[in-house]
Curated annotation (Swiss-Prot):
<dbReference type="InterPro" id="IPR017970">
    <property type="entry name" value="Homeobox_CS"/>
</dbReference>
<dbReference type="InterPro" id="IPR001356">
    <property type="entry name" value="HD"/>
</dbReference>
<keyword id="KW-0440">LIM domain</keyword>
<keyword id="KW-0804">Transcription</keyword>
<keyword id="KW-0539">Nucleus</keyword>
<feature type="DNA-binding region" description="Homeobox">
    <location>
        <begin position="180"/>
        <end position="239"/>
    </location>
</feature>
<keyword id="KW-0677">Repeat</keyword>
<dbReference type="InterPro" id="IPR050453">
    <property type="entry name" value="LIM_Homeobox_TF"/>
</dbReference>
<dbReference type="GO" id="GO:0006357">
    <property type="term" value="P:regulation of transcription by RNA polymerase II"/>
</dbReference>
<feature type="compositionally biased region" description="Basic and acidic residues">
    <location>
        <begin position="151"/>
        <end position="167"/>
    </location>
</feature>
<dbReference type="GO" id="GO:0007405">
    <property type="term" value="P:neuroblast proliferation"/>
</dbReference>
<feature type="region of interest" description="Disordered">
    <location>
        <begin position="124"/>
        <end position="186"/>
    </location>
</feature>
<dbReference type="InterPro" id="IPR049619">
    <property type="entry name" value="Lhx1/5_LIM2"/>
</dbReference>
<dbReference type="Pfam" id="PF00412">
    <property type="entry name" value="LIM"/>
</dbReference>
<keyword id="KW-0371">Homeobox</keyword>
<dbReference type="GO" id="GO:0021766">
    <property type="term" value="P:hippocampus development"/>
</dbReference>
<dbReference type="GO" id="GO:0021937">
    <property type="term" value="P:cerebellar Purkinje cell-granule cell precursor cell signaling"/>
</dbReference>
Length: 402
């Protein structure tokens, strides 16, 4: 039975053969698929193909974070954070100096580095340029900075002083050996206008839009991403402040007058806007609402009177007032020298007067009636009324008016 080669699929007629991956091979067919080098001691395979050690690690091994090429197991590397670099790729992005072990450096975008000397020199140059800013605010932006940018030219002095303080703080941190921020990126006026226009169109741009902005402005994509994050944060904060101001204006616009708990009501609040007046300290003769009948303090009449043929006249002496509409008289405290009712017509043939208005009594002189003046009933010296509700003395008689 003939044995066929796994590489060329031809029958193996040679005296010697190689067994690779449990299959028979010609000696000349066991070679690297990349460099065509014959493999005699050791080989690597992937997807049925054979590779030498260098080509296998170059293609499928760990990639260098600087050049994105594979790292051979024999190569010397440097490691920063979680990234691995070739020795030639681990250089300063400003002066291209190769960084050595133990040297202080500043990491930018995870795969770029700046040596300490270049970083300190750029910080001093930036501070000098910030002192000369006069027209527009080109505030520096750090990739780790999360505060929103100040876009108003009126705030140039504030942004300049804040940048000075930041630079001083960073220098102090460098002297103390603590963790420091990366270098700050200055955004120019034209770049800022481009970013503002892009933010007005799309507040949250996609990666493709950020790449286009990076090409237009020359800024790093990380810087652009952080600028948009800060600008969105500023917009949200401005909306919150405006909403809070609107609620506060609505609350204080029309304050209500509030009465303290347990406070007493005013007489004006109790009476409201009623058309009737209220006299609290009126000391003279007054009339108040009463019933449809009156009580008179008098002696025994000369003859029996009936409500139909009796008429009463109000006195016209000093201090007395004719009765008004819907105001029957109310008894009050009167002395014997000021009688309220002095005359009463008691002639049986005298007709009773017809009222002009309903509920109104008109004073009339006693001489009008044919019977002449009747003898008056004397008023009692002390009032026959016991209270403000006009209750008669039980010794007096009662006569109804209407």
């Amino acid at each position: 039975m003939m044995v066929h080669c796994a590489g060329c699929e031809r029958p193996i007629l040679d005296r010697f053969l190689l067994n690779v991956l449990d299959r028979a091979w010609h000696i000349k067919c066991v070679q690297c698929c990349e460099c065509k080098t014959n493999l005699s001691e050791k080989c690597f395979s992937r997807e049925g193909k054979l590779y030498c050690k260098n080509d296998f690690f170059r293609r499928f091994g760990t990639k260098c974070a600087g050049c994105a090429q594979g790292i051979s197991p024999s190569d010397l590397v440097r490691k920063a954070r979680s990234k691995v670099f070739h020795l030639n790729c681990f250089t300063c992005m400003v002066c291209n100096k190769q960084l050595s072990t133990g040297e202080e450096l500043y990491v930018i975008d995870e795969n770029k580095f700046v040596c300490k000397d270049d970083y300190l020199s750029s910080s001093s140059l930036k501070e000098g340029s910030l002192n000369s800013v006069s027209s527009c605010t080109d505030r520096s932006l750090s990739p780790d900075l999360q505060d929103p940018l100040q876009d108003d030219p009126k705030e140039t002095d504030n942004s300049t002083s804040s940048d000075k303080e930041t630079a001083n703080n960073e220098n102090e941190e460098q002297n103390s050996g603590t963790k420091r921020r990366g270098p700050r990126t200055t955004i120019k006026a034209k770049q800022l206008e481009t970013l503002k226009a892009a933010f007005a169109a799309t507040p949250k741009p996609t990666r493709h839009i950020r790449e286009q902005l990076a090409q237009e402005t020359g800024l790093n994509m990380r810087v652009i991403q952080v600028w948009f994050q800060n600008r969105r944060s500023k917009e949200r904060r401005m909306k919150q402040l405006s909403a809070l101001g609107a609620r506060r204006h609505a609350f204080f616009r029309s304050p209500r007058r509030m009465r303290p708990l347990g406070g007493r009501l005013d007489e004006s609040e109790m009476l409201g806007s009623t058309p009737y007046t209220y006299y609290g300290d009126y000391q003279s003769d007054y009339y108040a609402p009463g019933g449809n009948y009156d009580f008179f303090a008098h002696g025994p009449p000369s003859q029996a009177q009936s409500p139909a043929d009796s008429s009463f006249l109000a006195a016209s002496g000093p201090g007395s007032t004719p009765l008004g509409a819907l105001e029957p008289p109310l008894a009050g405290p009167h002395g014997a020298d000021n009688p309220r009712f002095t005359d009463m017509i008691s002639h049986p043939d005298t007709p009773s007067p017809e009222p002009g208005l309903p509920g109104a009594l008109h004073p009339m002189p006693g001489e009008v009636f044919s019977g002449g003046p009747s003898p008056p009933f004397p008023m009692s010296g002390t009032s026959g009324y016991s209270g403000p509700l006009s209750h008669p003395n039980p010794e007096l008689n009662e006569a109804a008016v209407w």
